[in-house]
Amino acid sequence: MKTGRAVTTICRQLNNNVIEIFGNSESGKSYLSKLIADRYEYVLFLDSVMKMTEESKHYIAQTNNLKDVEEVLSDIDLLIIDDFCQLSGDPKKNIYLLQEWIYNYKKLSIILINQIRANFNKQSVEAYKPYANYVLERYTDHRFMTSVENGEYVVTQIK
């Protein structure tokens, strides 16, 4: 689906859920999340790669530790984590903490931005998979893959 339709679809599905947006580098993941953020009033970007420099009407926390933002969650509508693989700690424990936040803060929705990485599992036929795929395919509510086709961003719903 095209970007505009993808934004509408993802916004409808966010409703107190955890959504993953994954894709290759430069495939529009951060761009898509910023378009989604513009539809929300209180947004916190957790910039774990410490690269966000542009001005924004939203809040930005440059850290790779989820615990650093926990105290402000009751005031936030949307938490965008860019990039999930850069968070400190075990991915399974991180996703459990995010699920706990979703349970405790009923107006909170979470978007995880994730990179596709080389898959070194010899038993798998896929050469590349999203980071912590084994955890995220079970514990995210919806998953979207971004790509670039003919110079345009394309978003595909996986789950």
What residue spans do the PLM features occupy?
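Short, well-ordered secondary-structure micro-motifs
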Residues: 55-56, 91, 121-125
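The Walker A/P-loop phosphate-binding site
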Residues: 1-55, 71
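Phosphate-binding/switch region of NTP-binding enzymes
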Residues: 108-159
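Conserved nucleotide-sensing/catalytic segment adjacent to the nucleotide-binding pocket
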Residues: 57-99
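Conserved Walker B
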Residues: 49, 83-85, 116
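Loop/turn-to-beta-strand initiation segments
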Residues: 75-78, 105-113
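Catalytic-core regions built around general acid/base machinery
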Residues: 97-107, 139
